[in-house]
Regions:
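Extended, histidine- and acidic-residue-enriched regions that form the cofactor-binding/catalytic faces
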Residues: 1-121, 125-213
Length: 213
């Protein structure tokens, strides 16, 4: 991320004027939509680690679009998602009911459709099943009624593991790679169950937001 402390706002449509949004629509811009939650990530990571990660992914993809001369915008991040994990027991973990998430996401997609955008791609960095099922329900129901279509990225190697058949029209298949190979990680035996706020997420946050670790 750039050093600008307001980038979580200015890198998205929140830093654009309405005329810039209109021009992006005319350019057939793709919408990148970061989603996540605000939840406890141990004493060493910020509550917003998931949304910082998904927003960083969107920012990096936007740079690729810019370099290729293609238009895209980043929607304001949605971070009041759901969690059923034990992080609910910690101060600072916000969680929403599935129906609340579905309704909120559908209304956001309806707005993007009303602006005139044609395609939206989600970027999710939170693995809780409540979150994923709510997002997918919102995508499926929105795709049935909106002109704009939304897509959920999934690594090819994880498609069946994540419960997909592989032929879903909203599924955006992306090439798999060893995530942990993206960072220099030294693991201890107790890190083998590296799911939440452990070696990988810590390395990731050191890479994108070092001042927060």
């Amino acid at each position: 991320m750039r050093k600008n402390s307001f980038e979580i706002l200015t890198a998205t449509m929140m830093g654009m004027t309405y005329e810039e949004v209109e021009n992006a629509v005319k350019e057939n811009a793709v919408v990148l939509f970061p989603v996540g939650v605000v939840e406890a990530h141990g004493p060493h990571l910020p509550l917003g680690a998931d949304i910082f990660a998904s927003l960083n992914q969107a920012i990096e993809i936007k740079r690729c679009f810019d370099d290729a001369g293609r238009s895209c915008v980043i929607a304001p991040p949605f971070y009041f998602g759901g969690t059923q994990a034990m992080t609910r027991q910690f101060a600072g973990t916000f969680t929403s009911a599935k129906d609340t998430i579905v309704a909120s996401i559908k209304e956001i997609l309806e707005s993007l459709d009303r602006f005139g955008f044609q395609r939206t791609v989600f970027f999710n960095a939170h693995g809780d099943d409540v979150q994923k099922k709510a997002m997918l329900k919102a995508i499926i129901e929105s795709n049935e009624v909106l002109k704009m279509k939304s897509y959920w990225p999934e690594y090819e190697d994880d498609i069946l593991y994540q419960g997909f058949k592989g032929d879903e029209d909203y599924l955006l298949k992306i090439a798999s790679f060893q995530l942990e190979g993206a960072f220099d990680i030294e693991k201890w035996p107790e890190d083998e169950f590296d799911i939440h706020a452990s070696a990988f997420e810590t390395a990731m946050m050191l890479d994108i937001c070092p001042d927060m670790v």
